[in-house]
Amino acid sequence: MFLINVWKADFGLDDAEAGRLSGIGIWPFAFSIILFSLFIDQIGYKAAMIFAFAGHIIWTVMAVSAYFVSDKATGYQLLYWGSLICALGNGAVEAFINPVVATMFSKEKTKWLNILHAGWPGGLVITGLLLIGIDSFAKDTPWAVKIGLIAVPAIIYFLMLIGLKFPESERVKAGISYKDMLSEFGVGGAAIVAVLLVLQLIDFFSGGGTLGIPVKLGFVALGVAMVVGFGVYTQSFGRPLLLFLIIIMIPLATTEIGTDGWITAIMEGIAKEQKFHAGWILVYTSAIMLVMRFFAGPIVHKLSPLGLLAISALLAILGLGYLSFAQGAAIFIAATLYGFGKTFFWPTMLGVVSEQCPRGGALTLNAISGIGMLAVGTLGFPYIGTLQTKAQQNAIVENTELQSQIPGLVAGGKVVPVTEKRIYEVIPYKVIDDAKVKELTSKLSVADAEAATKNLTETKDRSNQRALLDMAMFPTFMLICYIVLIFYFQSKGGYKPVDLVHAPTHAAADEY
């Protein structure tokens, strides 16, 4: 998250391509967490932990190597594939830790899942402070050193957990069969996963280019086969409530993970003008999350999980809207609103799923995380990148001084030197073509070209902030959905967790 702009410069990426690199570090998480959730009760939590450790160490080696290879293309491939391996490891971590906590604290799931997920912002705070410190006091430190730091926590958690005995899951204890677990997710859940997975596979094997129709149809057939197979086995569409929560999770993940992944890069131009490190915004909002998640218990008791989520969505809307134009100290006031807004999203949603769909065991609890990460990696990160390019072009159209400096830059209310691209073969976008801009400025005197280029760069940097207003549409959709759920549960007598009725034996849990 803190190195996106560094990698853009090193490997010559545009915003959407940088989003694609961020995405490969996200979406495999979904594949890993869902796959492990299907079999984790059989292979054991410790196996997932060992897999995660291996993934984090391999990523560290590949990423550090990417810095030292002389060929940029090879370095980029090491970074790209290493990010994929790291994401698989991240998914394995959450595949075992979520059900472990839900089992250990079955009467206070939302509270303890919030405390568990304080580790996410905690990691961002520690990493952010380390990297800002390095940038401040040892500016020439290679980014390979920064990436290498990931090996430290990986070794620590491996040594902490390798000798421990993990508990039996809540589902298995209750005697809920494997088929019943899958039935909670159903064909509906499988279809959502299949759509996102097919889009991602098409992009992954296209390498950012295009694939032939037969190959695309092959991936579509794979997705259809997955859904049909799931349906034949479970003979269930899935719980409607769970499917509704899954739909909410897609914009939720984009609001939290997508914005976190881009906010340092988006605010970099403004931060330079205000003379502070852009990383401070992410560190600050993450610090708010870290502290507040430890107090989720009494807040949930006061508001209910859905009330907390609705208020959080409202704060996120206000925070992102304010961040889109805030200047100076007001940036941190806006960031405070956004930080409080995003604090409880992810773990409280997991708590709601675990409390309302406990028969789904590790699958429903982890699959909703997986779908969120798959959505933000497949669509969220690149889409935010396209919002930036759109904001840049709008700012150029509004800058009449810049247009007078570079004749031919704008015509008919549109930026002329652009290149049309398509990410994931789904999202079309236009990016400002630096080579075409250079052709226009080459016709100017050296002094005029330098002044125009400086104006253009500053205009683009400042405009990125505006993209945050467009991102507010995600929590707006979420707020509407949470209000619908609040009224739904009120019609049922209020929000109450579902308790599993424990069977006298565990035999049913082992049936396929």
Protein language model annotation of sequence segments:
Residues 1-5, 188-216, 230-283, 377-390:
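Extracytoplasmic gate region of multi-pass secondary transporters
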Residues 108-131, 135, 365-388:
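Glycine-rich segments within core transmembrane alpha-helices of 12-TM secondary carriers
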Residues 382-472, 506-512:
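Low-complexity, proline/glycine-enriched hydrophobic segments characteristic of transmembrane helices
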Residues 132, 146, 151-172, 188-208, ...:
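C-terminal membrane-cytosol helix-exit motif in multi-pass small-molecule transporters
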Residues 73-93, 330-344:
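Hydrophobic core of transmembrane alpha-helices in multi-pass small-molecule transporters
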Residues 54-72, 314-327:
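C-terminal ends and interior cores of transmembrane alpha-helices
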Residues 20-38, 283-296:
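Central cavity-lining transmembrane alpha-helices of secondary-active solute carriers
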